[in-house]
Curated annotation (Swiss-Prot):
GO terms for molecular function: ATP binding; dTMP kinase activity. SUPFAM superfamilies: P-loop containing nucleoside triphosphate hydrolases. It comes from Escherichia fergusonii (strain ATCC 35469 / DSM 13698 / CCUG 18766 / IAM 14443 / JCM 21226 / LMG 7866 / NBRC 102419 / NCTC 12128 / CDC 0568-73). The lineage of its organism: Bacteria, Pseudomonadati, Pseudomonadota, Gammaproteobacteria, Enterobacterales. Keywords: ATP-binding, Kinase, Nucleotide biosynthesis, Nucleotide-binding, Transferase. It catalyses: dTMP + ATP = dTDP + ADP. ATP binds at residues 10-17. This is Thymidylate kinase. It is an enzyme of class 2 (transferase).
Length: 213
């Protein structure tokens, strides 16, 4: 069966946009042309509104978004994107390149926020079932490096303004999950840009050839 859903994950400032460009270039060199791009949260009209609510520091004024409310908004945006965009594209044989997916919630909310892992797993199974990316590229970067890059881009969103401790917990959970799942490939994003790009090219090329896609 052809596998064609690739997701790019990582902390803020890990280089996901650059990685996406390298993935696209690599796939094109392998003769793959039909691709769409998604981001989470977002990617549909409803999901983009939810993105604004959950990430815009000013979206709800002084009201505090609770941890469970945050999780539910992320999943509402995700399931809308999966059901209305990603699954239909995959059914047509189109490749989908995603900026974040469920691993982000497991790492950020499960690791960073400390939300109960059993609750997250139950919710994920309820709304996504066995739907998973075929390949996830996790760009591993320390919070110190990643946030320095993110701050250089300009104003930070609500999540990006969290503490170093939050991002250290998030990174630790990412690494833990990556070690448990062979479909998640870890890329050392603290290397030079040239080395990171080379690692991504090699990883994607090898994986595609292994799939016979």
């Amino acid at each position: 069966m052809r596998s064609n859903y690739i997701v790019i994950e990582g902390l803020e400032g890990a280089g996901k946009t650059t990685a996406r460009n390298v993935v696209v270039e690599t796939l094109e060199q392998l003769g793959i042309r039909e691709m769409i791009f998604t981001r989470e949260p977002g990617g549909t009209q409803l999901a983009e509104k939810l993105r604004s609510l959950v990430l815009d520091i000013k979206s709800v004024g002084d009201e505090v978004i609770t941890e469970k409310a945050e999780v539910l908004m992320f999943y509402a945006a995700r399931v809308q994107l999966v059901e209305t965009v990603i699954k239909p594209a995959l059914a047509k044989g189109t490749w989908v390149i995603g900026d974040r997916h469920d691993l982000s919630t497991q790492a950020y909310q499960g690791g960073g926020r400390g939300v109960d892992q059993t609750m997250l797993a139950t919710l994920r199974d309820a709304v996504l079932g066995d739907f998973r990316p075929d390949l996830t590229l996790y760009l591993d970067v320390t919070p110190e490096v990643g946030l320095k890059r993110a701050r250089a881009r300009g104003e930070l969103d609500r999540i990006e303004q969290e503490s170093f401790d939050f991002f250290n917990r998030t990174r630790a959970r990412y690494l833990e999950l990556a070690a448990q799942d062979a479909s998640i490939r870890t890329i050392d994003a603290t290397q030079s840009l040239e080395c990171v790009m080379a690692d991504i090219r090699q990883t994607v090329t090898t994986w595609v050839k292994e799939q016979g896609a």
